From Swiss-Prot:
<keyword id="KW-0699">rRNA-binding</keyword>
<protein>
    <recommendedName>
        <fullName>Large ribosomal subunit protein uL6</fullName>
    </recommendedName>
</protein>
<dbReference type="GO" id="GO:0019843">
    <property type="term" value="F:rRNA binding"/>
</dbReference>
<keyword id="KW-0687">Ribonucleoprotein</keyword>
<comment type="function">
    <text>This protein binds to the 23S rRNA, and is important in its secondary structure. It is located near the subunit interface in the base of the L7/L12 stalk, and near the tRNA binding site of the peptidyltransferase center.</text>
</comment>
<dbReference type="InterPro" id="IPR000702">
    <property type="entry name" value="Ribosomal_uL6-like"/>
</dbReference>
<dbReference type="InterPro" id="IPR036789">
    <property type="entry name" value="Ribosomal_uL6-like_a/b-dom_sf"/>
</dbReference>
<dbReference type="GO" id="GO:0003735">
    <property type="term" value="F:structural constituent of ribosome"/>
</dbReference>
<keyword id="KW-0694">RNA-binding</keyword>
<keyword id="KW-0689">Ribosomal protein</keyword>
<dbReference type="InterPro" id="IPR002358">
    <property type="entry name" value="Ribosomal_uL6_CS"/>
</dbReference>
<comment type="similarity">
    <text>Belongs to the universal ribosomal protein uL6 family.</text>
</comment>
<dbReference type="InterPro" id="IPR019906">
    <property type="entry name" value="Ribosomal_uL6_bac-type"/>
</dbReference>
<dbReference type="GO" id="GO:0022625">
    <property type="term" value="C:cytosolic large ribosomal subunit"/>
</dbReference>
<dbReference type="GO" id="GO:0002181">
    <property type="term" value="P:cytoplasmic translation"/>
</dbReference>
<dbReference type="Pfam" id="PF00347">
    <property type="entry name" value="Ribosomal_L6"/>
</dbReference>
<comment type="subunit">
    <text>Part of the 50S ribosomal subunit.</text>
</comment>
């Protein structure tokens, strides 16, 4: 049995978990999340703790325990604390701003790049070269951050582009130049 799958999930008092068939709904101060869990696992909520158990003795049920436990734990964390990803813009003239909910970025193209985030994702631009993405769903926050990063991924010669905060870009040496004769 999975070590992670065996660990119980602590449920804060302001979080409510409801189970209908294979659908798990988690409600808390930061929002409401819903997810389908695999049919060969079941969620048992008791005494402020949630435990993932196998529904049968098949091997796929055992294989999904750790994943299911982590997904439910992320849902609980998301509705209580929320998740955040930070992006940095590196390059001359690279900047970001918000126009309403729309993120507008100048990334060295001939046109500004605009991105409208999903309804439950919040984007903040505290500085022109910094973007903060917040939300309750960890998967969606990561997907939005990856989408914004994909507009101009860091290039390997000068490191210009949109990168995650703290991301290290391995720079290439570039051309060695012509040998002097």
């Amino acid at each position: 049995m999975s070590r992670i799958g065996r660990m119980p999930i602590k449920i804060p008092p302001d979080v409510k978990i409801t189970i209908e068939g294979n659908t798990v709904r988690v409600e808390g101060p930061k929002g409401r999340l819903e997810r389908e869990i695999p049919a060969n696992t079941k969620l048992v909520v008791e005494n402020g703790r949630a435990v993932i158990e196998k529904a049968g003795e098949e091997k796929p049920g055992t294989a999904m325990l750790g994943l299911t436990r982590t997904l439910v734990a992320n849902m609980v964390d998301g509705v209580t604390k929320g998740f955040q990803r930070n992006l940095e813009l590196t390059g001359v003239g690279y900047r970001a701003s918000l126009q309403g909910r729309k993120l507008v970025m100048t990334l060295g193209y001939s046109h500004p790049v605009e991105y409208e985030p999903p309804a439950d994702i919040e984007i903040e631009v505290p500085a022109v070269t910094r973007i903060i993405i917040r939300g309750a769903d960890k998967e969606k926050v990561g997907r939005v951050a990856a989408k914004i990063r994909s507009f101009r991924s860091p290039e390997p010669y000068k490191g210009k582009g949109v990168r995650y905060e703290g991301e290290k870009i391995r720079l290439k040496a570039g051309k060695a130049g012509l040998k002097k004769r």
